[in-house]
């Protein structure tokens, strides 16, 4: 994502949202051959996409069979879907982990206030076993950023959880 968008998206209002989304659609179309191919297959292009409702969404199955990336880059990290037994997991390649972290932290703080005002308690049984789960990554980062010693993962630690909550 070009630098101007990374700063623009965090201060966007409802009026500017649609225009920015259309700009990002055009960028994706121009710089992601897989996405452009899909958009063309469903008869969508910058010539006929004029509103949010016109923007085509890439099906999840593409994330299982392709490396979905806009421009060429080495990813900082990738996340995998949980999937089910015997299936191929989808992958989400992250170009800039700092931008990813800024995004979910700003989203949290926009809804709940400063992270330092919160204890973050993670109860994520099946996710903790997945080494590339985005939810575990996000919760771990929120735990770290909260700065509270009582923040943490409490899977199977019911006594400790009870004490923390009381």
Would you name each region that the model predicts?
Residues 1-80, 86-116, 121-122, 126, ...:
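Nucleotide 5′-phosphate-binding alpha/beta core
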Residues 134-138:
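Extended acidic/charged loop-beta regions that coordinate divalent cations
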């Amino acid at each position: 994502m070009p630098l101007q968008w990374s700063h623009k998206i965090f201060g966007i209002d409802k009026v500017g949202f649609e225009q920015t989304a259309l700009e990002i659609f055009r960028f994706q179309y121009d710089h992601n051959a897989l996405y452009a191919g899909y958009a063309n297959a469903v008869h969508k292009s910058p010539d006929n996409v004029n509103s949010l409702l016109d923007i085509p969404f890439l099906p999840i199955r593409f994330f299982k069979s392709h490396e979905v990336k806009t421009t060429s880059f080495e990813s900082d990290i990738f996340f995998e879907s949980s999937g089910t037994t015997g299936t191929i997991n989808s992958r989400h390649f992250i170009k800039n982990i700092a931008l990813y972290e800024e995004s979910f932290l700003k989203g949290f703080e926009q809804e709940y206030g400063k992270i330092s005002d919160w204890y973050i308690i993670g109860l994520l049984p099946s996710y903790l076993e997945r080494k590339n789960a985005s939810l575990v990554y996000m919760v771990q980062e929120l735990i770290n950023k909260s700065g509270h010693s009582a923040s943490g993962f409490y899977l199977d630690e019911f006594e400790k959880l009870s004490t923390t909550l009381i």
